[in-house]
Amino acid sequence: MTLLNQVKTLFQRETVFCVSLVLAVLSALAVRPDAAYLSYPDYRTLALLFCLMLIVAGFRSLGVFERLGRALLRRAGSLRELSIALVLLCFFCSMVITNDVTLITFVPFTLLVFRMIRREGRVLTLVVLETIAANLGSMATPIGNPQNLYLCSAAGLTMAQFARAVLPYAGLSLVLLLAVLLLQRDEPLGEARPEEEGEAAPLSALAPYLLLLALCLLVVFRVVGFVPVLLCVAAVVLAVNRRLFRSVDYFLLLTFLCFFIFIGNLKRIPALNDLLLSLVGGHELLAGILASQVISNVPAAILLSGFTQNFAALLTAVNLGGL
């Protein structure tokens, strides 16, 4: 494969990263690299993202979420109950493992189940509802998606401030999802059920990841520093399952880094800084929603956060705009 083809493939697979890299390089032409560049990144956010990706990979390696889905399935007595269980599973799991990981985990499981009960004609609607549920559920916690994690870390939002910004929307969305599911035509389930795959992971295998997740939550709310937790997570994963390091989305981390450089440089160009402050300040909700529609919610959160102090409004905007 030629270098040009490799670049083309990289751009197709990691479009947001490539765009962020180009923006960072172009901004560096206007603001020459110096020692101030080291102050651009939010190292706390980068460390937390890295740690959480390792922890979620650990949970997935133990089959935790698939087993949870099978347990709910065994208790479902009708198609409506099954659909509600799967949608709620996506909604609540996305609060911890992000919407992308939730969908990667449960959509294939849903397709398998509906093939086994011979209801393939009903699965598309359910997958759409699962996608909506995962996106809406992920907005309800600081670790549910990268933009929440970044804004909570950068702004130092308290749990109360975070809850006021997003929980009313998350709660309303859950009610609407349930209403749609209850209006669906109900049918009895067949006898087919997915079989259990091996023994459940023992609590001793889950314990390290649960403890590490608790430590990350303490970092989010600035109870403990991020450096000791980063070292702790890395050491535990090295000892327990070093292959998990391959599951980290390093391009996402590099995307954050490139946007930090781009925004840091923009703030050092007085004319652009003043213009963006006037456009964003006082208009965080509209600016966040529009930017999320154009460049997606994570870049929008990073970009706009450099030009406002109303982080709660921006948090609401990038979550709603990313739906």
What are these regions (language model features)?
Residues 2-5, 128, 160-202:
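Juxtamembrane and boundary regions of transmembrane helices in multi-pass small-molecule transporters
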Residues 20-26, 49-52, 77-88, 130-141, ...:
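Small-residue-rich segments of transmembrane alpha-helices in multi-pass membrane proteins
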Residues 43-45, 74-87, 116-126, 204-207, ...:
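Membrane-interfacial loop-to-helix junctions in multi-pass transporters
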Residues 86-88, 92-139, 150, 302-319:
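Hydrophobic transmembrane alpha-helices that form the pore/transport pathway of multi-pass ion
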Residues 2-30, 42-54, 205-216, 223-238, ...:
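Hydrophobic mid-bilayer segments of alpha-helices in multi-pass membrane transport proteins
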Residues 40, 62, 66-69, 211-306:
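Transmembrane helical segments that form the transport core of multi-pass membrane transport proteins
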Residues 163-174, 285-323:
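C-terminal transmembrane helix pair
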Residues 6-13, 35-45, 157-169, 198-203, ...:
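Interfacial loop-to-helix junctions that mark the boundaries of transmembrane helices
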